[in-house]
Amino acid sequence: MDNQHRKIAGYRELTQDDIDLMNRVKAVGAELLALQAALAGRLSTDLEVKQAAAKASKLAPEHESSPECVELRRFLAAEPLRWAAIAKTDIQTGVMALVRAIAQPEGC
């Protein structure tokens, strides 16, 4: 693109190597975000399966200690969906930080 090397206020002029590196960072970031989304989807499915199994195992209130209920409590205590969401934010932050390291804006 012709406008790739135009000066943006507050930023230095980027070389083609800078632009190529920035594009690599963005591509790897997109790949990581796709992996995170796949994991979050799998975890959501796991939660639904574990909830259904726990519900099916409780024929009476005293069955709260069934292996399925114990597994659901373990899963919920580990907070995997929360950690997957944190990972998404951290990936986005990391990509932004790498791009900023390449662009080297003035000020701020």
Curated annotation (Swiss-Prot):
Record Pfam families: Acb2_Tad1_hairpin (PF24729)
An annotated Gene Ontology molecular function: nucleotide binding
Regions that span the bilayer: none
Keyword Nucleotide-binding: yes
Binding-site residues, 3',3'-cGAMP: Q4, Y11, K26
Observed phenotype of the null mutant: Phage becomes sensitive to CBASS type II-2 system; phage titer decreases over 10(5)-fold.
Keywords noted in UniProt: Nucleotide-binding
Induction description: Probably not expressed during lysogeny maintenance, is probably induced during lysogeny induction.
Matching InterPro entries: Acb2/Tad1_hairpin
Family: Belongs to the Acb2 family.
Subunit structure and binding partners: Homohexamer in apo and 3',3'-cGAMP-bound form.
Cited function: Antagonizes CBASS (cyclic oligonucleotide-based antiphage signaling system). Binds and sequesters host-produced 3',3'-cyclic GMP-AMP (cGAMP) (thus preventing host CapV activation) without degrading the cyclic nucleotide. Probably binds some other cyclic dinucleotides as well.
Name this protein carries in UniProt: Anti-CBASS protein 2
Organism the protein comes from: Pseudomonas phage JBD67
